[in-house]
């Protein structure tokens, strides 16, 4: 099954993302902070296809989580999901290892399309 780890500190947004991705057929694990994302990633031995990360969170931010996950896995898809819309933030996220960058607000169709696109790339990396 397609597995996604979601790290978002805003409960309303996290629930919205979880519901939409479950409806799209994904197995979703959600956490509310960077520390929990890293702990869950470790506990699950990196057994996720995609990680969705907010950037601005209490404690460890999404950029740091992205960097640490990317150090452990070059094949997992990482999508930044954030209100930060400045070009410098987008470029920074992509430079440290994110595969895509979605700015809030976003629609369910945009979220699903971007997640599906990253999932296809992740699957293709295993076929090669």
Regions found by a protein language model. Name each.
Residues 51-56, 84:
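The short loop immediately C-terminal to the conserved phospho-acceptor aspartate in CheY-like receiver
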Residues 58, 86, 104:
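The feature encodes the CheY-like receiver
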Residues 8:
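Conserved acidic carboxylate
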Residues 30-50:
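Acidic, metal-coordinating helix/loop segments flanking the phosphotransfer/catalytic sites
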Residues 15-23:
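Charged docking surfaces used in two-component/phosphorelay signaling
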Residues 2-3, 117-128:
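Short, Lys/Arg-enriched segments at the junction into DNA-binding effector domains
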């Amino acid at each position: 099954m397609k597995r996604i780890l979601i790290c978002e500190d805003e409960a309303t947004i996290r629930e919205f993302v979880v519901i939409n991705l479950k409806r799209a057929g994904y197995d979703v694990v959600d956490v509310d902070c960077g520390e929990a994302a890293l702990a869950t990633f470790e506990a699950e031995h990196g057994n996720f296809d995609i990680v969705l990360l907010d950037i601005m969170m209490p404690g460890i931010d999404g950029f740091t989580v992205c960097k640490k996950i990317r150090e452990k896995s070059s094949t997992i898809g990482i999508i930044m999901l954030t209100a930060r819309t400045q070009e410098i933030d987008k470029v920074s996220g992509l430079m440290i290892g994110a595969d895509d960058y979605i700015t809030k607000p976003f629609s369910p169709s945009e979220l699903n399309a971007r997640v599906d696109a990253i999932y296809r790339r992740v699957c293709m990396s295993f076929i090669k």
